[in-house]
């Protein structure tokens, strides 16, 4: 067995490397709907989200779509005297399962029938971080460069207005902040290290202002998803304060996570689409060692 496959159990190896199939109704995730996301058990690449999982009655985990358009590859499979469409992971080329055209019509009509043994599950509160650090274009671009981060979405959170638009949030009356939702692999990077990146990539002593952006929607904030995340943030902030790391007091707020509303599509991955766009962050810091 290759070195990067030595961590696999027998069934994980047979499924991902030899295209075996698990027994229906007797596998780990067939009836699990805990919020979170699923990674390739071989490589750790992001494959599926729990929000896209549904009960198909087939006895294997079923998803209406992959986590993003290029998360998986599909190929013709003529084994067992059948014509099917096989699903494999893009980077590790792991066999995952098959996709069929009998999924829920309201979800697009597809059913990704996936072996549990090909997946590693990360619970939402263990692999998700919500931060606000000024203009979300820059914050997104920074965290996309951090090793262990799987996906970053920009959006709005922290307020009470339902389904806000960018125009709504710009008024400063919604209570929402421009924020990022980060999915990360806790086996690669810890939440504490993400916090350290957060405090490094913006000015947490500047009240409602980052760069040229001013207003409560540009506040410095950590939106915690669990008591553990809250405690880790409080501990790190206390350590920084005690060590005099910053010349002024921290103004970062600790807020319990509320609904996160993804921003309009043109805001997503903005600085990749618009390389000359406004950025208040030194992006190179994302790849430099933490203190």
UniProtKB/Swiss-Prot annotation:
UniProt GO MF annotations: L-methionine:thioredoxin-disulfide S-oxidoreductase activity; peptide-methionine (R)-S-oxide reductase activity; peptide-methionine (S)-S-oxide reductase activity
Region ranges (Peptide methionine sulfoxide reductase A): 127-284
Catalytic activity: L-methionyl-[protein] + [thioredoxin]-disulfide + H2O = L-methionyl-(R)-S-oxide-[protein] + [thioredoxin]-dithiol; L-methionyl-[protein] + [thioredoxin]-disulfide + H2O = L-methionyl-(S)-S-oxide-[protein] + [thioredoxin]-dithiol; [thioredoxin]-disulfide + L-methionine + H2O = L-methionine (S)-S-oxide + [thioredoxin]-dithiol
Keyword terms of this UniProt record: Multifunctional enzyme, Oxidoreductase
Active site: 113 (nucleophile), 135
Keyword field contains Oxidoreductase: yes
GO terms for biological process, alphabetical: protein modification process
EC number: 1.8.4.12, 1.8.4.11
InterPro entries listed in its UniProt record: Met_Sox_Rdtase_MsrA_dom, Met_Sox_Rdtase_MsrA_sf, Met_Sox_Rdtase_MsrB_dom, Mss4-like_sf
Enzyme class of the recorded protein, top EC level: oxidoreductase
Domain MsrB: 1-124
Gene3D superfamilies the UniProt entry points to: Peptide methionine sulfoxide reductase (2.170.150.20), Peptide methionine sulphoxide reductase MsrA (3.30.1060.10)
HAMAP family: MsrA
Listed PANTHER family: PEPTIDE METHIONINE SULFOXIDE REDUCTASE, PEPTIDE METHIONINE SULFOXIDE REDUCTASE MSRA 2
Family that this chain belongs to: In the N-terminal section; belongs to the MsrB Met sulfoxide reductase family.
Cited function: Has an important function as a repair enzyme for proteins that have been inactivated by oxidation. Catalyzes the reversible oxidation-reduction of methionine sulfoxide in proteins to methionine.
Protein name: Peptide methionine sulfoxide reductase MsrB/MsrA
Record organism: Treponema pallidum (strain Nichols)
């Amino acid at each position: 067995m290759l070195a990067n496959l030595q961590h696999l159990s027998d069934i994980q190896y047979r499924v991902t490397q030899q295209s075996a199939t698990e027994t229906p109704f007797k596998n780990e995730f067939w009836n699990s709907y805990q919020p979170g996301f699923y990674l390739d058990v071989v490589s750790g690449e992001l494959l599926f989200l729990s929000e896209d999982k549904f009960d198909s009655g087939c006895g294997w985990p079923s998803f209406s779509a992959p986590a993003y358009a290029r998360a998986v590859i599909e190929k013709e499979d003529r084994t067992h005297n059948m014509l099917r469409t096989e699903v494999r992971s893009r980077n590790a080329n792991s066999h995952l399962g098959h996709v069929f055209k009998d999924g829920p019509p309201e979800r697009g009509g597809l059913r990704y029938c996936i072996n549990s043994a090909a997946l590693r599950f990360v619970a939402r509160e263990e692999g998700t971080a919500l931060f606000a650090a000024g203009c979300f274009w820059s914050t997104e671009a920074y965290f996309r460069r951090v090793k262990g981060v799987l996906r970053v979405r920009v959006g709005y959170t922290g307020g009470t207005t339902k389904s806000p638009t960018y125009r709504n949030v710009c008024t400063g009356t919604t209570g929402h902040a421009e924020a990022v939702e980060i999915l990360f692999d806790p086996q690669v990077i810890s939440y504490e290290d993400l916090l350290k990146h957060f405090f490094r990539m913006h000015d947490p002593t500047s009240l409602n202002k980052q760069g040229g952006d001013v207003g409560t929607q540009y506040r410095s904030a950590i939106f915690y998803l669990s008591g553990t995340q809250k405690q880790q943030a409080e501990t790190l902030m206390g350590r920084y304060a005690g060590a005099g790391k910053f010349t002024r007091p921290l103004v970062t707020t600790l807020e319990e996570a509320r609904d996160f509303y993804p921003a309009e599509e043109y805001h997503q991955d903005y600085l990749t689409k618009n390389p000359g766009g406004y950025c208040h962050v030194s992006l190179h810091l994302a790849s430099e060692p933490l203190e």
